[in-house]
């Protein structure tokens, strides 16, 4: 269903916006969700997507969406302002701990080793959720299809000596983490990250966000977009540890209280009360 009062202004006037049918929320048990989808996907290039992200949209493959739920606004788009980021003691410790990891930035591409790590991660972290049964095609559609400026970042340990395999002097170090990012006009957008799940107390996810912040700084980009934060979701709690954290509230970006106590009520009938769509 198109919402005329939320049609975009130029240069997005060629896009249309539709609300999906209701479906079970994947973040909060017992809730019903809907999404607003931007179409057609072939018109969403990097410049257009930058404006959409600033308006609270995200992407999954070539599918660009934002939450559009009846009576709920628990999902808050969040971003870190790079120049004002202040790492806490734990984040500095994690940064130092994984300082030897070698990050390689590459175009999106399929690699059997990456897919194997993805499946280990899903089986350990999201068992029974469906993604732990993703086929190669589903993996590629989810993470390797993009119409914008996207990159795959591979994190490996430094190469080691292989005395038992002297024929492999240039063997890469052990793969620890893969991160997909989008390069926007005003920042980096974190798409998805998966890492070796069998290692305790690694905090790879925290290191990855810290790395993205430093990468954005080196590219002179002002923001790192972290997707959605839900105060009631333990899986998303780590995002609130990055300070300052800005959230998109009622159409405007502002600094959030780390506790989330300054957020509007989650249960609120908001259809018909949103501000006009103005990216």
UniProtKB/Swiss-Prot annotation:
Keywords: Acyltransferase, Cytoplasm, Transferase. It is an enzyme of class 2 (transferase). This is Aspartate/glutamate leucyltransferase. Belongs to the R-transferase family. Bpt subfamily. Functions in the N-end rule pathway of protein degradation where it conjugates Leu from its aminoacyl-tRNA to the N-termini of proteins containing an N-terminal aspartate or glutamate. GO terms for cellular component: cytoplasm. GO terms for biological process: ubiquitin-dependent protein catabolic process via the N-end rule pathway. Its main location: cytoplasm. The lineage of its organism: Bacteria, Pseudomonadati, Pseudomonadota, Betaproteobacteria, Burkholderiales. It catalyses: N-terminal L-glutamyl-[protein] + L-leucyl-tRNA(Leu) = N-terminal L-leucyl-L-glutamyl-[protein] + tRNA(Leu) + H(+); N-terminal L-aspartyl-[protein] + L-leucyl-tRNA(Leu) = N-terminal L-leucyl-L-aspartyl-[protein] + tRNA(Leu) + H(+). GO terms for molecular function: arginyl-tRNA--protein transferase activity; leucyl-tRNA--protein transferase activity. Its EC number is 2.3.2.29. It is found in: Cytoplasm.
């Amino acid at each position: 269903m198109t919402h005329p009062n939320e049609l975009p202004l130029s240069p997005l006037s060629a896009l249309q916006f539709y609300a999906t049918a209701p479906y079970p929320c994947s973040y909060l048990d017992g809730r019903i969700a809907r999404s607003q989808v931007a179409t057609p996907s072939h018109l969403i290039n990097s410049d257009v997507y930058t404006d959409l992200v600033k308006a609270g949209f995200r992407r999954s493959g070539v599918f660009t969406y934002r939450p559009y739920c009846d009576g709920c606004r628990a999902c808050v788009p969040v971003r870190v302002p790079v120049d004002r980021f202040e790492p806490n003691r734990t984040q500095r410790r994690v940064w130092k701990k994984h300082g030897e990891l070698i990050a390689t930035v590459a175009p999106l591409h399929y690699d059997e080793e990456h897919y194997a790590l993805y499946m280990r991660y899903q089986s350990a972290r999201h068992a029974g959720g469906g993604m732990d049964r993703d086929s190669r095609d589903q993996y590629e559609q989810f993470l390797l299809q993009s119409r914008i400026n996207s990159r795959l970042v591979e994190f490996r340990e430094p190469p080691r000596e292989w005395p038992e395999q002297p024929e492999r002097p240039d063997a890469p170090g052990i793969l620890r983490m893969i991160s997909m990012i989008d390069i926007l006009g005003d920042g980096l957008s974190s798409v998805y990250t998966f890492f070796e799940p069998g290692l305790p107390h690694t905090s790879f996810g925290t290191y990855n966000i810290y790395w993205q912040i430093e990468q954005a700084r080196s590219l002179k980009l002002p923001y790192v977009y972290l997707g959605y934060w839900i105060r009631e979701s333990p899986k998303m709690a780590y995002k609130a540890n990055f300070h300052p954290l800005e959230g998109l509230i009622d159409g405007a970006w502002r600094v959030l209280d780390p506790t989330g106590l300054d957020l509007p009520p989650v249960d609120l009938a908001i259809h018909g009360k949103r501000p006009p769509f103005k990216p």
